């Protein structure tokens, strides 16, 4: 098994409900180490840039609005097969379809307010990490 890094985000719907610690605990309890973390309030430009891949999707405006509505925790997680493990821990995008014990089943309010984001592939992880962090900010 390979030690890898992935990008993780705790979204405003969760931070506004003071769930940062509870969600962080789930990552750590499942063997993922937080090697970089910061609290940001995304600007419209940052949200549009980060989610540019969804620009033509009908939910893009709502997504940007939600992501700029409050503080967000951006993180780099490290561990064995971190990308897959994080995706399993998060659960399905739609919390109604997420497995019991996953972050989204436990904390998400809806498909639009699903509490967390995580990279889906090594290339995406590298891009998303670089969007928010300089290499010197990742210590682990």
From Swiss-Prot:
This protein's encoding gene: ndk
Enzyme Commission identifier(s): 2.7.4.6
Localization per record: Cytoplasm
Origin: domain of life: Bacteria
Job of this protein: Major role in the synthesis of nucleoside triphosphates other than ATP. The ATP gamma phosphate is transferred to the NDP beta phosphate via a ping-pong mechanism, using a phosphorylated active-site intermediate.
Family stated for the protein in its record: Belongs to the NDK family.
Name recorded for this polypeptide: Nucleoside diphosphate kinase
Named cofactor requirement(s): Mg(2+)
Chief localisation class: cytoplasm
Active site: residue positions: 117
The entry's keywords: ATP-binding, Cytoplasm, Kinase, Magnesium, Metal-binding, Nucleotide metabolism, Nucleotide-binding, Phosphoprotein, Transferase
One cellular component (GO) term of this entry: cytoplasm
Amino-acid positions noted as binding ATP in the UniProt annotation, renumbered to this chain: 11, 59, 87, 93, 104, 114
Oligomeric form and interacting partners: Homotetramer.
GO biological process: CTP biosynthetic process; GTP biosynthetic process; UTP biosynthetic process
Annotated GO MF terms: ATP binding; metal ion binding; nucleoside diphosphate kinase activity
SUPFAM superfamilies in UniProt: Nucleoside diphosphate kinase, NDK (SSF54919)
Pfam families recorded: NDK (PF00334)
Catalysed reaction, written as an equation: a 2'-deoxyribonucleoside 5'-diphosphate + ATP = a 2'-deoxyribonucleoside 5'-triphosphate + ADP; a ribonucleoside 5'-diphosphate + ATP = a ribonucleoside 5'-triphosphate + ADP
